[in-house]
């Protein structure tokens, strides 16, 4: 049930609603007032638009423009009777002037419709009305507008224009305001003030796709340097830069280290940033070490000069380094000299080609001109040929002379042939320049310049047969027929003369011309100028034409200037020139030609199919670089580029991403550079190991296939590296590692060319073997299948296994290939053994393991373990047999003693034995200490008994028998003659007692005289801390209580002996037994066990009573006030049965001079047989407990007080129950029943439990170790 809203909640809601409405009303009021102010400013200037002072007032603005606004605002104020709705705002006409048909030089002409004049304003949709008819109630007086826009200025009529104030009254008026519709806007007439710029004389630059105006303004890049980028970067550094101040840097880094900012950085911190911080910290640490050394006077600003060490003799390596240094210098100088020589030779060659013939003659050796070397005899040369004048009369002699001369000329060397070819080229050039008309003049010119021409009637100078020339005597005929013995006659000489004349009359033709730059001009062109004219039409062809017709070039080439020397007749002038003739400077593309020799795969270096083609784009000449990569704002400084790295210095040579098949076609990882198809790249089969029959076929998961493809792409067809990388990355089990053959087989038959090909080792008709494991879709884990599903019924298991000799089959099962047959060949495709085989061969051919990969591995491991066990047993039996047969030679009869074989003890047994031995040693030491203490205690008891007897004789009869002790406090007696409880001794008295006890122990340790009661207490040091004083106080209380118990027990025994005859009856004499304040004989909650009829415990022997007193003491007081045994380490002490604390050792010797029974009257009265009421006893006990707690500095709480009382009562009950079976002093009071022993060994829990017996043979309880 929903609760009703309270009155306070309703009031709060109404208040919030009214407040929000009031805020909205105030916002609307402010907006309304602003809107009214804008409307007032828009309506106000409409009557002053033609006023000349309007512009000046509008510029000044201010509060004067709002004059009359308050009266006008009252009419349109929000509320009842407001006339806001009566305001009407006319529409705004077009602000921009109407379009015209003026043609500008830089704009295309557009035919636009003409705008109607002002006479047709009646047809407009928004007619302009007269201002007097406006419904807008303006606060100002309406002034009629002057529609005449013309005015006379200095007698000059202005051009018809429109004042902007008529269209837009004020510049700051919003755009949504329109002038009154009564305003008649005349037609806009543009002024003739457009003066366009003159047409530029130079055409504008057409930017190419790879250029921009910004890039063209940048300066050119510097030339590439041959040095590395690092050298240029080092050169960029300034050598004269001042060294930084190290101490200033240290102060800066120490005050504001960069490392502190990096650790709290909110942005990404790169490695370079951390390196900067590390360098900074390294510098700071170095400077700190320097400052530390300076403080220790171990740093000097002037470092001492390093001492010169002894000379080291040179070794062979030192001499070799010296020689290498000298050779390096020699080679560097030789290289520089060769560079200088080559430069000088290049300058001389250029100078030679640019020199005139006279200058060339001066430049040549000896000052002779070019071609004059034939006039200089060469030593050892036969000399130049001589012209022989032949007379007609001596024909026979001439014939003999010609024959002999011909034989001499045949012996000339190749030098003459070279000179002849050079002379012939020189003659041809001069003939082209002179252009002789008569061929006979050519012969004369040749004779003038020195060319050898055969004389009339002589044979050819070269001795070579020309047209129709007969062979020499003794040589074979030209037609192959033998020559007779006839001698050459004049007919042959005349024929030779006629042939020579025909040769001289024959015209010379042009040959190919070689230019100085190495280009060869075709013989159809005389010079390079003709080539430029011939290929002009090709270069002038528009870019839109994709082809060029060479037939159109015939006329242009024939129109060239006729050459001096005609071309060969084989070159027809009507035949068009080819592209290789027109462009000899460009390499023509030719496809790869078949090899001509046996080297099939040798690359054709002379072919042009692998070279750069013709110059078709400027990208082939330049390297386009984006301007953004150069970063001109960063690297362009004062018009110079500062580039030392980046894409500008990128190496041109780089390795491209070549497909693996292309790489494999040119190079193979297994040797050889000849390309081989992928079929020939099969990896040779890896040698099978000895236990190959134990290897199961491995399955390939999708992840492994992906890794294999990645490695094949990374290391193309390097199967050794692929297998190694695959096993490192994917395989974790050694038995599942893949070898290179398996990797190649998986790739070839799954992803390579053999994907759709049948395997060579698989029979074509054999069905695929049944899978031995089923792989779940999406997983790579094989699910084992029962063996019955693997094997085929009626067929041995080996029939379902792949062949052992071929490559491993990719089957679903994990079965092991069978063993080879006795002939050395495995059964093909796991077929059953033939029937003729023996049983042994059948068993050998049968597969050893079957099943999944895991089961096969487990079986193999199990068999290996069994074989190892058998070998171990065999080796052990053999060793026993050898030991039995071995004869033992006894050197002495003591060596023949047989010792029982004892197994080695475990560490726990050794520790236990050591502990038992230490316990025995400690007990023996403690017994000796106790005996010494008992001897000293007997001496003190005798002295106490003597002093007690003396005091008893001097005491009145009505006083209780209390031993008279020195410094004893008087006992206050009650009204019935019983002693009253007294308060505990003061702190100073207890401190004095502790000092006296310490002095007594020191005297006993030093061998002083025992029994001296006059022990001078040591003064208490006033500067001791409160904790030390409290500890000494507790020790004094403990020692005083123990000494009082012993003395009172002695006095009680003596009193019983002296009063026994006189007392009579069953009443026992009063006993002055003193006990610990925490050990009460009986409490209301815990009654004492073994008490007599009167409720008083029987009196034990003095030694046993001392033990009982030790058991009744509090654990806290006994722990802090115990006296350590004589020279017994704490870890070797064994507690006795007389105490419940594990740290209290045997009773110690009590010092003399301690008051007996001081502060213990209640316990003494109870020991004497005086019955103390429970209330009085509890009061005394509580007082003692409070005093003890206050002395120890603990907080006194009821819970803690009650716990201490219960513990004291329980301990007292245990001590009383043990009185019936006391132990002798010689036994060390360890046989008291019911008291637990807290020892180091967990095997001993109490005195009744026996020590644990050792499992090994030997003395019981570890006593014999």
Swiss-Prot record:
- Biased region (Low complexity) positions are 124-139, 555-570, 772-787, 1053-1062
Q: Which Gene3D superfamilies match?
A: Homeodomain-like (1.10.10.60)
Entry-linked SMART domains: HSA, SANT
GO cellular component annotations of the record: NuA4 histone acetyltransferase complex; nucleus
Skewed-composition ranges (Polar residues): 800-821, 1073-1083, 1212-1234, 1242-1253
> By its UniProt entry, which InterPro entries does this protein fall under?
Homeodomain-like_sf, HSA_dom, Myb_dom, SANT/Myb
- In Pfam terms, one family for this protein is HSA
Extent of Basic and acidic residues compositional bias:
423-441, 498-510, 838-853
Residue span of region Disordered? 114-140, 225-244, 404-510, 555-575, 755-855, 1053-1093, 1212-1265
* Domain Myb-like: start-end pairs: 700-751
Report keywords, A-Z: Activator, Chromatin regulator, Coiled coil, DNA damage, DNA repair, Nucleus, Transcription, Transcription regulation
Q: What is its main location?
A: nucleus
- Has UniProt tagged this entry with the keyword DNA damage? yes
Start-end of Acidic residues biased regions: 449-478
Where along the sequence do coiled-coil regions lie? 871-944
Q: Which GO terms describe its biological process?
A: chromatin organization; DNA repair
- Subunit note: Component of the NuA4 histone acetyltransferase complex.
Family from the record = Belongs to the EAF1 family.
**What function does this protein fulfil?**
Component of the NuA4 histone acetyltransferase complex which is involved in transcriptional activation of selected genes principally by acetylation of nucleosomal histone H4 and H2A. The NuA4 complex is also involved in DNA repair.
Q: Which PANTHER family does the UniProt record give?
A: E1A-BINDING PROTEIN P400 (PTHR46459:SF1), E1A-BINDING PROTEIN P400-RELATED (PTHR46459)
What is the name of the protein in this document?
Answer: Chromatin modification-related protein EAF1
Organism from which the protein derives: Cryptococcus neoformans var. neoformans serotype D (strain JEC21 / ATCC MYA-565) (Filobasidiella neoformans)
